[in-house]
């Protein structure tokens, strides 16, 4: 049985004070929670501080992006070896904000996936359609294309131990969310798409939902059979709000 994963993406938010305060709150809120893996991805500048603050807890450290190069003349970038060295485990790639604001292509994101696997890190591959694509009935074809960029270059075995986060772009930070039934349908499509290559890998892969996940909709989302947790944005910046989502995932998957 798949173990749910709830991960907080802090995006461009944080300060030295906020990192300590939020992690202290998370440790208190989640101290007795079992049955759900938890990770947070602070901005790169605070990863070392966050790692120290997380010491001795069950909360894993993640990061929001990675470069395709391991070292060299690449000003401003962060490499997979650096993230591994500092203790990060789950690395978000392909977030729609990176795809949109930094013009990252499916092929470029597949290179990031490859470098993370080579370094023994866990890729959290974000996929999802825009509102325009959704209205045009292209949700499945867009998700398939984004997955195939990895499948066609690395093979299905690369998805062993990886994470996919389905984040409909129209639901990120908008307050809109896919209904549980809508989200489940896409998650099932994603799993079935990978199962065409390898059913066993498809069954073990964690597929998170992301896009305005909050305390009100978390329990119903997690009750769906193919939704294995969440990639949480805004709600991950408040310990109590994030904890409610983690507890909902743990409870739903134990049921």
Swiss-Prot record:
GO terms for biological process: gluconeogenesis; glyceraldehyde-3-phosphate biosynthetic process; glycerol catabolic process; glycolytic process. It catalyses: D-glyceraldehyde 3-phosphate = dihydroxyacetone phosphate. The active site is at residues 95, 167. It comes from the Bacteria. CDD domains: TIM. Keywords: Cytoplasm, Gluconeogenesis, Glycolysis, Isomerase. GO terms for cellular component: cytosol. Homodimer. Its main location: cytoplasm. Its EC number is 5.3.1.1. This is Triosephosphate isomerase. It is found in: Cytoplasm. Belongs to the triosephosphate isomerase family. NCBIfam families: tim. PANTHER family: TRIOSEPHOSPHATE ISOMERASE (PTHR21139:SF42). The gene is tpiA. Substrate binds at residues 9-11, 173, 212, 233-234. GO terms for molecular function: triose-phosphate isomerase activity. Pathway: Carbohydrate biosynthesis; gluconeogenesis; Carbohydrate degradation; glycolysis; D-glyceraldehyde 3-phosphate from glycerone phosphate: step 1/1. InterPro entries: Aldolase_TIM, TIM_sf, TrioseP_Isoase_bac/euk, Triosephosphate_isomerase, Triosephosphate_isomerase_AS. Involved in the gluconeogenesis. Catalyzes stereospecifically the conversion of dihydroxyacetone phosphate (DHAP) to D-glyceraldehyde-3-phosphate (G3P).
């Amino acid at each position: 049985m798949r173990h749910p994963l709830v991960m907080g993406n802090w995006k461009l938010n944080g300060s030295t004070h906020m990192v300590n305060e939020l992690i202290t709150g998370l440790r208190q809120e989640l101290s007795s929670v079992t049955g759900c893996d938890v990770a947070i991805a602070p901005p790169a500048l605070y990863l070392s501080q966050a790692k120290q603050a997380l010491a001795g807890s069950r909360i894993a450290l993640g990061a929001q992006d990675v470069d395709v190069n391991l070292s060299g003349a690449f000003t401003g970038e962060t490499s997979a070896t650096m993230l591994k060295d500092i203790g990060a485990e789950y690395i978000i790639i392909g977030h729609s904000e990176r795809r949109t604001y930094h013009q990252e292509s499916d092929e470029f994101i597949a290179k990031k996936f490859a470098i993370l696997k080579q370094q023994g890190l866990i890729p959290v591959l974000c996929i999802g359609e825009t509102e325009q694509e959704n209205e045009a009935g292209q949700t499945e074809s867009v998700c398939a294309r984004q997955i195939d960029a990895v499948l066609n270059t690395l093979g299905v075995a690369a998805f062993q131990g990886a994470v996919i986060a389905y984040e409909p772009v129209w639901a990120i930070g908008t307050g809109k969310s896919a209904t549980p039934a809508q989200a489940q349908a896409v998650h099932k499509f994603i799993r079935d798409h990978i199962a065409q290559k390898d059913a066993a890998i498809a069954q073990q892969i964690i597929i998170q939902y992301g896009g305005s996940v909050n305390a009100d909709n978390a329990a119903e989302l997690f009750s769906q059979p193919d939704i294995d947790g969440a990639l949480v944005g805004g709600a991950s910046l408040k310990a109590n709000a994030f904890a409610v989502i983690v507890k909902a995932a743990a409870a739903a998957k134990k049921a």
